């Protein structure tokens, strides 16, 4: 599954659940909260796994708000990053 497919799957879920109108600032507050939980539980793999997934979904929600083409951004990111490997 591509990043854009994951983004679209989250968009579909958001719409069904009524979360598709959640403001980006509110989503970022949730990101902060999830990062706090993650920081407090770094020795608990099950919690880390869960929080990473929560964060991924929140990032995909933000990408939906901005119609971000995540596949293209991924490619651009790594092309730009390659210069640091030389």
Locations of regions flagged by a protein language model:
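Flexible "arm" and connector segments at domain edges
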Residues: 1-52, 56-86
């Amino acid at each position: 599954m591509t990043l854009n497919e994951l983004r679209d799957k989250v968009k579909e879920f958001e719409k069904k659940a009524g979360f598709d109108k959640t403001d980006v600032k509110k989503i970022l507050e949730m990101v902060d909260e999830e990062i706090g939980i993650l920081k407090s539980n770094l020795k608990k793999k099950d919690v880390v796994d869960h929080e990473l997934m929560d964060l991924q979904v929140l990032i995909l929600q933000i990408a939906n708000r901005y119609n971000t083409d995540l596949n293209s951004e991924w490619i651009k990111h790594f092309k730009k990053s390659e210069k640091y490997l030389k």
